Each structure stands twice: as C-alpha cells, then as structure tokens.
Amino acid sequence: MGNMRSLVKTLMVVLFLGWILVWIMISTNLFKSKWTPKLSKYLNTTYFGPQGTNLVLLTVPMMFIAVLSCVYLHIQKKPTQPQREWKLKRIMGRVIMVMNPLGIVTATELTFSLLFVALLAWSLYNYLYLSYHVHLHNDDNAKIWQAKFRAFGLRIGYVGNICWAFLFFPVTRASTILPLVGLTSESSIKYHIWLGHVSNFCFLVHTVVFLIYWAMINKLMETFAWNPTYVPNLAGTIAMVIGIAMWVTSLPSFRRKKFEIFFYTHHLYGLYIVFYVIHVGDSWFCMILPNIFLFFIDRYLRFLQSTKRSRLVSARILPSDNLELTFSKTPGLHYTPTSILFLHVPSISKIQWHPFTITSSSNLEKDTLSVVIRRQGSWTQKLYTHLSSSIDSLEVSTEGPYGPNSFDVSRHNSLILVSGGSGITPFISVIRELISQSQNKSTKLPDVLLVCSFKHYHDLAFLDLIFPLDMSASDISRLNLRIEAYITREDKKPETTDDHRLLQTKWFKPQPLDSPISPVLGPNNFLWLGVVILSSFVMFLLLIGIVTRYYIYPVDHNTGSIYNFSYRGLWDMFLGSACIFISSSVVFLWRKKQNKEGDKEFKNQVQSVEFQTPTSSPGSWFHGHERELESVPYQSIVQATSVHFGSKPNLKKILLEAEGSEDVGVMVCGPRKMRHEVAKICSSGLAKNLHFEAISFNW
C-alpha cells in the first residue's frame, strides 16, 4: 500500500509541475511563436477544434490530478506520516507575519503567495513584451501609444484569467485537491477572497482601459457590440457589472452589516460565469475549466445531499441562550475534530444555509452528531424562537460534515487550547476525540490546558458540553485536562440565578421522512467521488469531440471565423453541466440504494422509540444547584476548572510557561485580536516549541 501511495503521489507531482510549467511558458514569445504552431498541428484536431491545445495542456492534467487525489486520500484514510514529512510540515506551518489585512500568514502561505504574485508579474511582463515588441495589434489604425494603451488593457485581462484558474478551488467543500496540501474549504476561503480581489481589479482595469480607448477613437458603442464570429463585448460588459455587484457586497464593511444582501448577490456567480465564458470563448474557458468543473460537481452533490431531511433528535437551550442540536447519524459516518455542518431550516429561509461547529466525536458517539449554535443575527434568532416554542418537530436539512482529512490530536506532548466566547466549540470535539483515544491504553495522550474567556458568568454553561452525559469515571480517567476560565465583564459570581437561565432540553418526535445523516460522496467515499469526476470528464471529452467533429467542423473547418464564437463556449458549458448531472446522479442514486437497508433499519428503530417530553433539566452546575453531585461529567468539570473574574488571560505568560515542554501544540479560536496575539507569541524568538494553529469563524 505504501508503494501505491508513493506512485500516486509521484504521478500527481509530475502532472502538477507540468501544469505549472505550461502556465509559466504560455505568456512567452517562445510558446507563442515556436510551441503553439507545433502543438496546434497535433492537438487542434477536428474533434476539439481551436480549444484542443488548452484542453490537453491545462484541463486534462488537473482533472487527472483530481482523480488521482481521490485514490491517494482513500489509501491515506489512516495516515502514518514519516517523521521527516511531519517536521517539514511544522516548519512550513510556522507563522511568519501577523498583519492586517492579510491576517496570520504562515511560511507555506507566504511562499505560495510570493510564487503566485511572481507568476502574475511574469505573465504580465511577457504579454506586454509580445504586444509592444513582437506584434502590436492595431486594426483600428489608432496612434501607436493608443494601441499600446489598448494592449495593456487586453493583457491585464489575461492576468485576471490566471486568477480564475484557481478561484474556485478554495470553495469546493468536498475538495480532493485541498487536503493534499493540508487545507480545508473553510480555512481556504481567504484565498478565494484574495483571488477574487485581484481578478476583479484586473477585470475592472481591463474594462476601464477599453472604455477609454474606444472613447479616444470615437467607437464607444463597441461596449455593446456582439460580434457573432469574434469576442462579444456586450457579454464582457454584463459580466463586469455582475462582478462589480458581487465585489462591492463582499467587502468586509458591507458583508458584516448586510450579510443577506451579500449572500443573495454572491449567488449571481452562475450568471457571471456564463457571460464570462461567452466573452472569452471556449479556448480561454479551457484554461480555467478544471476548478469550475470540480466546483460544480461538488455543488451538485451537495444539492443531492440537501434534498434529504435529517433526523433532529433533541435541542438543548443553554443558560447563555445558545443552542446545542443533536442529530441522528449512521455509524458509518466519520469526521474529524473541528469539522463543520451546514444547516438549512426551510421554515426560516428557503435558500439560506449556515455552517456550525460540530462538538461531538464520531469515534465516541457512533449514532449521534451535535452542533452548537450561537444566537447572533436574524437567522439564529428565528431558530432560537422556533425551538423555544411548543413545537414537537422541526424540518432540517444538513450538508456535510466538512473538516480536515486527518487530525491527529495526540501528536503533541501537551496541548493548549485558547478560546474566546463561542470559539470554545471546536475544542469540545478535540477533547471528546481525546476521550475516545484514551480507551486505547497504548495511546499516549497529551496534557490539555483549556484557556477560555467569556463575557458573562452564565456563558460558563459551554463547559457543560465538554463531556457527554453518559461518560463514566473510567472513560475520562486517563485524560489530564485543566481548565482556566476567565469572566471578563463580571467581578464576582452572581448571588442568584433566574429560572430561565436553567439548561433546558427538548426532544423531538421522529417524522416518517426523516433520515439519519449518512456518508455522501466526498471524505467518506473518496473512490466513488473519483468515479464521478473521471466518468463525467471522460463523457464530456467524448461529447465535445462528437459535437465538434460532426456539427461544428462541417461549418467552420477549424478556421475559428465562421461558426458562432459565443456558441462554442455555450456548448462547453451545456455539455459539461449535462455530464456532471448524469454521472453524479447515477453514482449518488447507486450509493443511496446501497444505503437503503441501513435507512430502513434506522426508521424501524425510530418507530420503536418512545417520545420524550420537553424538560427543564437540573441545568448547569454553575446555575442549577439541584444537579446531582454524583454526576461524573460535571463533577470532573468542577474539579478541573478554575474561574477568574474581572480579568483577561495573560496569554504571553501562559504560553511561555508551557514553552519549556518538548512539543506544545497551540490552537486558538476566537476574536481576531486574540488569534493575532497568540500567533505573535508563537512566532516570536522566545517560543521555539510552540506549534500554532488557528480556527476562525469569520472571513
């Protein structure tokens, strides 16, 4: 198995290096004058037409990397990283700088960012060199400086297209590409944002330059021209208008204040892609096709998963007015700590989906999955109101879980978890995973220090969620956990506690259409996902070959100047979408049929379960004095916790005191200021053994 893994990895590296080499060379005069004529002779066949070269050089390698990555990740389900690889990962994951607006930048991020910027600068330089010194396009008989001005606008649009070749990789939730470099879709959203800013800037400059150029030569109406055999300018204008709307509403100042406008506007991306492809044509579309193709496979599979209703078992309303929802799941569904689950409640919004942190462990809780929801914003407020009312069921759809492909919580000698407010939720799943690993006596567990900050005393109810209710003393006896809790806005413990602050649990009636959350194509079924990617892409190649050879070629004869320019791009989009729809649907339905027996067994179990009425349980030990003292989970929490009032944690002191240990893992989740403070401490010269990792809820 190790040899197979090495072989697959080598093939992926070779394909990727070749793909990058093409991107480096494609802007050069050597590629344009020497390579292109030879490549076109063999690759621009009657079956693929003018798009053949880009299809073979820039689409095929990345699609096969995606297929091979499915095989690689399937082999690596239980990873055993060599010590050399692990040391390299630590070095490349070290924080290099902490600064706004980039945030926390690691060595890996800085390296790849500099290389990507170098690629953009290299490409722009070579494109301009071609225009200014080799062949200056001047069909309008404009002045030389005007023609050069136009060339600059055209070439910077080409640079924006390079950004689009990577734009959708970070937001493909069940991506098989991101795990290869240790990333998840949630942690990669910032790269999507950076690429979006750069590409929109390039396209805006491209548009403005052409508007000025056309105004200078008295052809401003070219903005609305739609040439049937050449680039349709109107399509580009429409795409730019949509792009500006998406860009403006995605800016942090706008997005955080008016999230729903941002959310709905961002769903115009489909329309943006359509007009963009019509504008640039099929050949240029093939340059960016892999990330769009993989994104839409992921998007359609997510849609298929979301059509099922998930079985909501119970809801706990915490004294802090936050919620814990528990769903039923099949034992075969596995996920890693710090994973997230997307929720959709049709009675609140027909189209909105929101991500929430999973607090359970799939190795500890085989049949249930829990998420914690902070009451913040209109959607969560409506959900809280629904659950607080006298309902006995709630229709919920889920999507996910999504998280790291691997997460070895016991890889460090000691572990420091720093959280602020609801940032504690990812660490609940980490601690529960450690409890699961503690059942294996041969596993060495790290010492765990949880440093958590809350605004108010009642927020300590989050600590009630750390241990499952059915834990015994033997289950947690090997876990060395210490909790330092800080209450920043209160100087002492409140003398009285209102009744409404008690922890309440509500149980829901099972409904006939409810199903447990089950594995879908992706992290739990990499090979089946590989089948979808391979079959849909091969089908696309076959269909585009048939259409080109027997429908387009008899009209155009590979001249590129007779058959409608826009139709070529539309054919690519239509056939690609059809292949994704057919292949994904067939494989998904096949997998659904295989899981049908498990669903039947689940429904039989559900029908035999007696419905429990809503209860106001004794509540948190912080608030409900009626809590039974012999309750093992809460007794353990009390013994492990020290509460500090009216102060914030001295993170520098805490972290540097622990730095003397041989290997200390530091994870932080909370406000930006807290994350940046911890990152600066871990990256300072005083801390050599602190290995930093951040989790963020906002972007």
UniProtKB/Swiss-Prot annotation:
PANTHER family found in the cross-reference section: FERRIC REDUCTION OXIDASE 4-RELATED (PTHR11972:SF79), NADPH OXIDASE (PTHR11972)
Induction field: Induced by copper deficiency in a SPL7-dependent manner.
An annotated GO BP: monoatomic ion transport
Residue positions binding heme: H192, H206, H266, H279
Protein name, entry field: Ferric reduction oxidase 4
Localization terms from the record: Membrane
Protein origin, superkingdom: Eukaryota
Family classification: Belongs to the ferric reductase (FRE) family.
Enzyme class: oxidoreductase
Tissue and organ expression note: Expressed in siliques. Detected at low levels in roots, cotyledon veins and shoots.
Membrane topology (Cytoplasmic): 1-9, 74-101, 215-264, 333-525, 591-699
Function: Ferric chelate reductase. May participate in the transport of electrons to a Fe(3+) ion via FAD and heme intermediates. May function as root surface cupric chelate reductase and participate in the reduction of Cu(2+), for Cu(+) acquisition via Cu(+) transporters in response to copper deficiency.
Needed cofactors: FAD
A GO molecular-function descriptor: ferric-chelate reductase activity
Sites where the protein binds FAD: H354, P355, F356, T357
InterPro entries assigned: Cyt_b245_heavy_chain, FAD-bd_8, FAD-bd_FR_type, Fe3_Rdtase_TM_dom, Fe_red_NAD-bd_6, FNR_nucleotide-bd, RBOH/FRE, Riboflavin_synthase-like_b-brl
